[in-house]
């Protein structure tokens, strides 16, 4: 994919977001992860829309309780035990959101997320972060600190033109 040319060799983390729910960010992040895995890259997709996890439905995961929130709540948890292989491709792995916590923003602000990403970088060629809509909550802005590249999803005849102002502001501020 063209995204590979936008990243340096040591850059592995791609954040996918949108302005509001329903624009297709989970669809795009899932297909991006699948495409990279079909190129022979070892890829993990991380469900960081922890208020409204979408990866469980996309990948038909049965164990919805185990995921990144367990690690963020308790960094003593073995992160790699929470990563699940996918049925799609041997190179594709999924780290779902897990149980919806009472304090999502607080969990994402802690340095546990930074440690999780560093651990995943040791095991995977690419880390795709499926995040919450940026126009709804501040979670994605907090997650942005660990990303090397952001993909902003806009859906034709769905994303309002006024929301493009937010996209331009975020780009200008390099967030």
Where are these regions (language model features)?
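P-loop NTP-binding module
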Residues: 1-175
């Amino acid at each position: 994919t063209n995204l590979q040319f936008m990243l340096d060799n040591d850059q592995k983390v791609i954040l996918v977001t949108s302005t509001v729910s329903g624009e297709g960010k989970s669809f795009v992040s899932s297909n991006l992860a699948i495409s990279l895995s079909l190129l022979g890259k070892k890829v993990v997709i991380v469900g960081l829309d922890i208020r409204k996890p979408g990866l469980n439905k996309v990948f038909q995961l049965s164990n919805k309780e185990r995921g990144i929130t367990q690690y963020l709540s308790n960094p003593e948890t073995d992160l790699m035990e929470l990563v699940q292989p996918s049925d799609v491709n041997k190179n594709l792995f999924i780290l779902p959101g897990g149980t919806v916590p009472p304090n999502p923003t607080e969990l994402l602000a802690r340095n546990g997320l930074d440690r999780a990403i560093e651990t995943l970088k040791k095991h995977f060629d690419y880390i795709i972060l499926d995040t919450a809509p940026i126009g709804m909550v501040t979670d994605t802005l907090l997650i942005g600190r660990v990303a090397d590249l952001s993909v902003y999803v806009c859906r034709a005849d769905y994303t309002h033109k006024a929301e493009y102002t937010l996209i331009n502001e975020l780009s200008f501020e390099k967030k």
